Amino acid sequence: MTNSVDFSGRPFHFIGIGGIGMSALAYVLAKRQFPVSGSDLRPNHITHKLESIGAHIFGRQEASNLEFFRPQVLNSQEQLAADTKSKLPQVICSTAINTNNLEYKAALELGCPVLHRSDVLAALIADYYSIAVAGTHGKTTTSSMIGYMLLEAGLDPTILVGGEVNAWEGNARLGQSQYLVAEADESDGSLVKHAPEIGIITNIELDHPDHYDTLEEVIDIFQTFAKGCKTLIGSIDCATVRDRLQPTISYSLHSDTDADYTVTNIDYRADGTTALVWERGKALGVLKLRLLSRHNLSNALAAVAVGRALGLEFGAIAKGIATFEGARRRFELRGEVDGITFIDDYAHHPSEIRVTLAAARLQARPGQRVVAIFQPHRYSRTLTFLEEFAESFTHADLVVLTDIYSAGEPNLGQITGEQLAAEIAKQHSQVVYQPTLPSVCEYLLQTLRPGDLALFLGAGNLNQVIPEVITAFCEPAKATS
């Protein structure tokens, strides 16, 4: 692979263009009028959107896709002439693409420059006044909130995030200003390539055991990223961030710390959260947000710190945060039918599950059941955090567990969803194992009752059953109306 990105007009071709990170890059490049194409085995609304702005999408990943670009002029040795070789596309891959992928191999044989997704993001970050959000948890919400805040303040940023946001109807937007807000992913170690003007680190924990063996390895990656940031903003509520990274600007939910930004008078309500924000000992004003829970208040405080670093008045910051509705699949309300509330959340790490269920408990009315439906994500993560997962469901009244979503990992026979269910059952009296999505759907139709808050958790495809369950609950209502 190379790491040099050509922005002179050379085409970009993405293998796996429908992925959340890949599609964001493809969208911004297409909107900047670069020729963009890509392949994906599972065309979806994201690939359809890319087609609508001029991207050419292939429904298969095969060598013939790159024949689309093969120049017609060859020299006598049947080699690509220099002037035509320069017109070959830059082929972009993510870590998910195997080196045995036929399209990937064809790109190498044809002589295309092959780049990792992170190389393109790093080049865009270098091309703008960039704000990059990193951390084990909270990246998507924090980066989306910062992007929305800057948009509402009239700064018209370019935004690339790891989730879809209703405000810009997708996971990316192209602005016309110098500002870029990006979510910076640590999962494969490529975080070290980014050198933004402002970097944010929300927290650091061990995750992605398919790539990291120890927390120390994760810390090394974040330390390298931190050194590349001209200004580093970090939450000192995370001891690792506080002690090992020593951010330039700090924030904390605890007013008795020496953080630059703190809060007091925190009030959690069913319709959101309010708090009084302090800047280096001086009260800035009241911050209101529609999102619940301590972790979202912490995310909002990071956004305040960014806004102030950019010179925004607190009033403009607070106005943007107050109207931010969140990203999709981040405690997203999917519907309310027959007195049952359906919420979709991307949580797939024990810490994320714990705080998400705590937020659900805050929102639940007295006597309302919190039903957690969880699809474990990756065998390696499930095995590594088996004990932690078992202790993460204390705020749920009922836990429904599916089999493990592999996310492309091989099943080595070391762990199953049923084993995880048994571990959770040691800590929780109401645990049910339903291995498949159809069996989950059938069980929920028999079990959910008016007043329940049904929370679907996981980074896999569990959320696909939500419309089916909602529709099924609607049918009896139609029949009796």
Curated annotation (Swiss-Prot):
It holds the Pfam family Mur_ligase_M. GO terms for cellular component: cytoplasm. InterPro entries: Mur-like_cat_sf, Mur_ligase_C, Mur_ligase_C_dom_sf, Mur_ligase_cen, Mur_ligase_N, MurCDEF_pg_biosynth, UDP-N-AcMur_Ala_ligase_MurC. It comes from the Bacteria. GO terms for biological process: cell division; cell wall organization; peptidoglycan biosynthetic process; regulation of cell shape. It catalyses: UDP-N-acetyl-alpha-D-muramate + L-alanine + ATP = UDP-N-acetyl-alpha-D-muramoyl-L-alanine + ADP + phosphate + H(+). Its main location: cytoplasm. Pathway: Cell wall biogenesis; peptidoglycan biosynthesis. Coiled coil: none annotated. Keywords: ATP-binding, Cell cycle, Cell division, Cell shape, Cell wall biogenesis/degradation, Cytoplasm, Ligase, Nucleotide-binding, Peptidoglycan synthesis. ATP binds at G135, T136, H137, G138, K139, T140, T141. One of its GO terms (molecular function) is UDP-N-acetylmuramate-L-alanine ligase activity. Its EC number is 6.3.2.8. Cell wall formation. Belongs to the MurCDEF family. This is UDP-N-acetylmuramate--L-alanine ligase. It comes from Nostoc punctiforme (strain ATCC 29133 / PCC 73102). The lineage of its organism: Bacteria, Bacillati, Cyanobacteriota, Cyanophyceae, Nostocales.
